[in-house]
C-alpha cells in the first residue's frame, strides 16, 4: 500500500511522524499520539488512542513505527481518492447541480450509458436509494448505494 506514495509524500509523512514521535525513538506511543491529538483540539480517551494504534500496529508491539505509519497514511489517502471520485460521479448525475438526483436526471445518464430503462425501473432505482422518501437521491444516499456495491 505504501509503495503507491510519491517521494514527496513520504518525506512529508516523515516530517509528520517526527512531530508525533516526541522522544525521537522511531515509535509513536499512545502517550505521544494523545499529546499531538490534544494539541489539535481533540480529546481522545486512552481506549480510543489504543484502538487507533492497534488499527495499524502490524507487529503487535503496541506502538506505531514509520512503515506502519506510512501504511496508515496511504490507506487514508486512498479513502480520500474514492470520496473525490464519488463526488465527481454525483456531479455527473446531478445535471442541474441542485444537490439532488431526480428520476429525470437518472434516466438521462442511464440512457447516455446505453441503458434503456422503463419509468418503472428508474422509479425503482430511486426508491431503493431514497432513504428519506423525498423522491430524489441526495449525496449521502448516493454514497450509501455506491459503497454497498
UniProtKB/Swiss-Prot annotation:
Pfam families: EF-hand_7
Annotated keywords: Acetylation, Calcium, Metal-binding, Methylation, Repeat
Residues engaged in binding Ca(2+) 2: 57, 59, 61, 63, 68
EF-hand domain location: 8-43, 44-79, 81-116, 117-149
CDD domains: EFh
Residues binding Ca(2+) 3: 94, 96, 98, 105
InterPro entries the UniProt entry points to: CALM/Myosin/TropC-like, EF-hand-dom_pair, EF_Hand_1_Ca_BS, EF_hand_dom
Classification via PANTHER family: CALMODULIN (PTHR23048:SF53), MYOSIN LIGHT CHAIN 1, 3 (PTHR23048)
Any further remark recorded for this protein: This protein has four functional calcium-binding sites.
Protein name listed in UniProt: Calmodulin
Record lineage: Eukaryota, Viridiplantae, Streptophyta, Embryophyta, Tracheophyta
Gene name, Swiss-Prot/TrEMBL: CCM1
Amino acid at each position: 500500500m505504501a509503495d503507491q506514495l510519491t517521494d514527496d509524500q513520504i518525506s512529508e509523512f516523515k516530517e509528520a511522524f517526527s512531530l508525533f514521535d516526541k522522544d525521537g525513538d522511531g515509535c509513536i506511543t499512545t502517550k505521544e499520539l494523545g499529546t499531538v491529538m490534544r494539541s489539535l483540539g481533540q480529546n481522545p480517551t486512552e481506549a480510543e488512542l489504543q484502538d487507533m494504534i492497534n488499527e495499524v500496529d502490524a507487529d503487535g508491539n503496541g506502538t506505531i513505527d514509520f512503515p506502519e505509519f506510512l501504511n496508515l497514511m496511504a490507506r487514508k489517502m486512498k479513502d480520500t481518492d474514492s470520496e473525490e471520485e464519488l463526488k465527481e460521479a454525483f456531479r455527473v448525475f446531478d445535471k442541474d447541480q441542485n444537490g439532488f438526483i431526480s428520476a429525470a436526471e437518472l434516466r438521462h445518464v442511464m440512457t447516455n450509458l446505453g441503458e434503456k430503462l422503463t419509468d418503472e425501473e428508474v422509479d425503482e432505482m430511486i426508491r431503493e436509494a431514497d432513504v428519506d422518501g423525498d423522491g430524489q437521491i441526495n449525496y449521502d444516499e448516493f454514497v450509501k448505494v455506491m459503497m454497498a456495491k
